[in-house]
């Protein structure tokens, strides 16, 4: 999703593959998968990000997600 990241592609791909495997294990349809992923993002923001930064980070995340989805359409 991110153009530039401080994390290596290998590390990101490994975590992504683990998360996909969990969703497949539970045979989660797209809507349930999105609910779970959304709840995970919310939990990360609430538990790990200061109150003053949450909205800004949530906006940056949603903008990056929209940019990624729009890029996939072309």
Curated annotation (Swiss-Prot):
User: Which InterPro entries does the entry mention?
Assistant: UPF0352 (IPR009857), YejL_sf (IPR023202)
Instruction: Show the Pfam families listed in the entry.
Output: DUF1414 (PF07208)
Which Cys-Cys disulfides exist here?
none
Highest taxon listed in the record's lineage? Bacteria
| Gene3D superfamilies for the chain | YejL-like
Family listed: Belongs to the UPF0352 family.
Q: What is this protein called?
A: UPF0352 protein PM1884
Ranked from the top, the taxonomy reads: Bacteria, Pseudomonadati, Pseudomonadota, Gammaproteobacteria, Pasteurellales
């Amino acid at each position: 999703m991110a153009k530039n990241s401080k994390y290596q592609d290998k590390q990101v791909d490994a975590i992504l593959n683990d998360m996909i495997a969990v969703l497949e294990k539970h045979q989660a349809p797209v809507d349930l998968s999105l609910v779970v992923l959304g709840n995970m993002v919310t939990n990360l923001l609430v538990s790990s990000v200061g109150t003053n930064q949450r909205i800004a980070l949530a906006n940056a995340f949603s903008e990056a997600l929209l940019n990624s989805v729009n890029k996939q359409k072309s």
